[in-house]
Amino acid sequence: MKNKRNNEKYKVGKNLKGKEMEIDVAFFSGKERAESSDGVEALKTEKIIKPVNGISAVILAAGKGTRMKSDKTKVLHEVSGKPMLAHVIDACLEARVSDITVVAGANMQQLKSFAAARYNGKNIRFVLQKEQLGTADAVNSVIKAKIPLKDGVMILSGDTPLITADTVSYLIKMFTKKSDGGIIGVSFAENPAGYGRIVRNSEDYVMRIVEDKDADDREKTIKVINGGIYIIRKDSLERNLEKIKVNKAKGEYYLTDIAALMYAEGRPLIPVDVPYRELAGVNSRAQLAEAAKIRNKKVLEKLSENGITIVDFDTVYIEEGVEIGNETVIHPFTVIKSGVKIGKNCSIGPSAHLRQGAVIGNNCKIGNYVEVKNSTVGNNTNVAHLSYIGDSEIGSNVNIGAGTITANYDGVKKNKTVIGDGAYVGSNSVFVAPVKIGKNSVIGAGSVITDNVPDDSLAIARPRQETKTGWVKKRRKK
């Protein structure tokens, strides 16, 4: 019988009590199943699934990332405004996994500095993997360090920035309800070349994981691949890590070998389908860009579902952590960084750049080639063309003319510009901060404002125009 890939419930085999198990998303097909019915005698023995007393996360982040060609460690390169490792940690925290251990190598100090700045007060430990001896050795470093792990140990890679809290939660649910040994995240790939293949018995328990280079002709036809995310009972993990032998060709210990060991002892891994994209590891700058593109699309889709119009998904870039009000329109070639807040009924772009600290009120227009950074813009205010607003406080009902610049940096520190409610700023004006413009004041076009302007005042700060009638004709006669 063939089970087609679809979104229906799918029976993955009987558990130790003889009851059929299901996962929410089917991915197996008959032709991909390893043609083996060996089974394990221990599986036929009825056993009760032991309750799980909590989940610990172990995140592998010691890799050198040489293909990135960077002094910055690979897992700290950013996707959608935050480091890859932060995406993985945040997915765990959002899934209520607060006991987290990160395995580091030579990048230990970089990772500790990152965590101190971003997760101060969170229970995040670091363990050193002294030598790069493979994924099993990395996990064993945590065991040898006598970290007090909980009953379920979730193992993830720090370079998978597309992983979501929903997937982590789903895997934990499947582990606690279905497995007496462990589960492994897997996915279906039309082109599985380069990935480890999941070899299963007739009941869909994982018999072993075969790396692509080691797969025979039959195994190469398997399209169910290893996702590199596991949840394994602590006692089984500790016991089987000690049994993993070094790969003679590479001189490393592979965590994938644990699948065959767990199968042999009658506590096999259960395969659980996870979205293919979420498994993708980042090893190069090109893959980093691809991950950012995928993350960005998810951000835009979510905003669209909440009543925001994104005119062109291909050219708008919005990082995670941005708040945008209903009925706002984001035009093409606009970049909005994490932490920006935009009110309702606004028009942003095209080609606008909103950076950290920008807070835009309701019914505002931030138009062509406008950059706003660390500034508040009040309700019903227009900054329509070719302007830089930095370290500023702009009131409500203000009109900022084209080419306006807030000159905020004096060579030592950033200074603030304040423009009161109802002010009108003529085109090509420059505010040399610190400076304050009063309510309902008017700034003449082309002015360079260096002094404060009181409420209801007109300020003009430009050379007086001088016109010499007939000057051109006189010049020609010379």
Describe the predicted segments one by one.
Residues 2-4, 8-28, 38-56, 83-156, ...:
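Conserved N-terminal catalytic core of the sugar/cofactor nucleotidyltransferase
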Residues 53-79, 95:
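Glycine-rich N-terminal loop/short-helix segment of MobA-like nucleotidyltransferase
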Residues 318-366, 371:
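Acidic, glycine-rich loop-and-beta core segments that form the ion-binding/anion-interacting portion
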